[in-house]
A protein has these predicted regions:
Chain B
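Short internal beta-strands
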Residues: 44-53, 84-92
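Extreme N-terminal starter segment of soluble prokaryotic enzymes
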Residues: 2-7
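A glycine-rich helix N-cap at a beta->alpha junction
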Residues: 63-93
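Trp/Phe/Arg-rich N-terminal binding region typifying the photolyase-homology
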Residues: 33-34, 51, 72
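Short, basic, glycine/proline-bearing loop/turn elements
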Residues: 55-62, 105-110
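Short, glycine-rich nucleotide/cofactor-binding loops
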Residues: 8-25, 57-66
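Histidine-anchored nucleotide/phosphate-binding helix
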Residues: 20-42, 47
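Low-complexity intrinsically disordered segments
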Residues: 93-94, 108-131
Length: 119, 136
């Protein structure tokens, strides 16, 4: 089994990139691969707990919690989150808070990296 | 395993989005990556400015005055100061009419490194020799 690291930079609403990243992570984890997710830029928006699932919008909290239960490591860029007014005490439990070198270290140990930035 | 090469491609213009800044800050973070790795392991980032990304390399940004944020110029300078290898596509600065003497230099901060103006073929070589490529 391999190690996959995914870094979606888009927010949940307004783009389907995050939705795709979470579902890809679930598929890889279900197949037994080790999966890491790095959340930075607008991608940090998904860490907020108590998201309301409205049918017109993608929904992340349920998927993120499932991924965490499957052993997927999810880490958010602390500076990016704080800059957007998102604090640790209102985030989904189990998500790590760190900085960009966490991502580089995961890249080092990954067989594949999917970097979904540049928008 | 020991060191691996990572290519950071910056292709977006400055300040239009957060993208260029993120490319640079992710690359700069290589300095402390060993906190999470074993002895002898590490990453070697190479930052390449191509397309409209070369506009990030023009000196004398006024972002603090206009936007109240740290300039991308200061990120470029800090990157040079921490010995990052940074490349600017020669064809693209020529295409946009940017003279080489308008590019950022961190000599005033004591940096040994300089932005390296190289043909695109050299950037392709960097891509070919990198384990992973990140496009910003």
């Amino acid at each position: 089994m391999g190690t996959l690291t995914i870094a979606p930079f888009a927010s949940l609403v307004g783009s389907k990139s995050m939705d795709f990243a979470l579902k890809l992570a679930k598929t890889a984890a279900d197949k037994g691969h080790k999966v890491n997710i790095w959340l930075t830029s607008n991608g940090v928006m998904i860490v907020k707990a108590n998201q309301k699932h409205l049918k017109d919008y993608s929904h992340a909290e349920k998927y993120v919690k499932e991924l965490l239960e499957k052993g997927v490591e999810v880490c958010v860029c602390e500076a990016c989150a704080l800059a957007r007014g998102i604090h640790k005490n209102e985030a989904i439990e189990g998500i790590k808070w760190d900085a960009m070198h966490w991502y580089l270290a995961k890249i080092y140990n990954s067989d594949r990296v999917i970097h979904m930035g540049g928008e | 395993m020991s060191m691996i090469d990572l290519a950071f491609i910056i292709q977006r213009p400055p300040y239009k989005s957060e993208t260029s800044t993120l490319g640079l800050t992710h690359a700069i973070s290589y300095q402390v990556v060993d906190m999470f790795l074993d002895d002898g392991q590490g990453v070697i980032p190479k930052v390449c400015f191509i397309g409209e990304g070369v506009f990030n390399c023009i000196s004398e940004h006024k972002s603090m005055e206009n936007y109240g944020v740290t300039s991308i110029e200061s990120h470029v300078k800090n990157s040079l100061l921490v010995d990052l290898d940074m490349y600017v596509c020669k064809e693209d600065i020529d295409r946009f009419g940017i003279p080489e003497n308008r590019l950022v230099d961190a000599e005033d901060m004591g940096a040994d490194k300089k932005l390296q103006i190289v043909p695109f073929s050299e950037i392709q070589n960097i891509l070919n020799n990198s384990k992973h490529i990140f496009i910003f």
